């Protein structure tokens, strides 16, 4: 697809301006930031995760509005492209999933994730947490799949550590999938997250979840 490029873009960073004249995607970016603005993220009493979901559900995907952020890399399963930091309260990312690729099974570093499909479809596998007593005793504790869901263009999903672990994959062997993710607080970017082995249940921590691009500019 023409808006997926494995190269450095010459686009200028987004500079906040008056909402008037912005397209629907960048209006969504502003609205998400406004909802999170007075708080420290979705854990705060004055923010309802449903408000985030409703805002994302109200946006109809238009690739001309977000394509500048959709940078891909064929050497990776997917790329994490930063769009906005929500006044330091969150990370809003466009993820580009290569055909047939998937994420590892992972947690969310005690943060909340709201995800919208911008293009294509993604498959989510959810898992129970492994039994910590077995892990501490050096025993294998294979992860149990609790739910499988196909998410299609414009659908929205919510995930947090309270719901378990998950893995996201692009089931299409020929086409990219693209999704918009809001993480709040932005713990994974600052402190990393844990990846899990499906057969043993054992985990290892990665120190930081890095970005492939920042506001349309490849890093």
Curated annotation (Swiss-Prot):
Paired cysteines (S-S): none
List the coiled-coil residues: none
The residues the record assigns to binding Fe cation are: 106, 108, 166
> What's in the keyword line of the UniProt record?
Dioxygenase, Iron, Metal-binding, Oxidoreductase, Thioether bond, Virulence
Post-translationally, this protein is described as follows, namely: The thioether cross-link between Cys-113 and Tyr-183 plays a structural role through stabilizing the Fe(2+) ion, and prevents the production of highly damaging free hydroxyl radicals by holding the oxygen radical via hydroxyl hydrogen.
Free-text cofactor note: Binds 1 Fe cation per subunit.
As one GO molecular function, the record gives: ferrous iron binding
Q: Which GO terms describe its biological process?
A: L-cysteine catabolic process
Q: Known PANTHER family for this protein?
A: CYSTEINE DIOXYGENASE, CYSTEINE DIOXYGENASE TYPE 1
Q: What is this protein called?
A: Cysteine dioxygenase
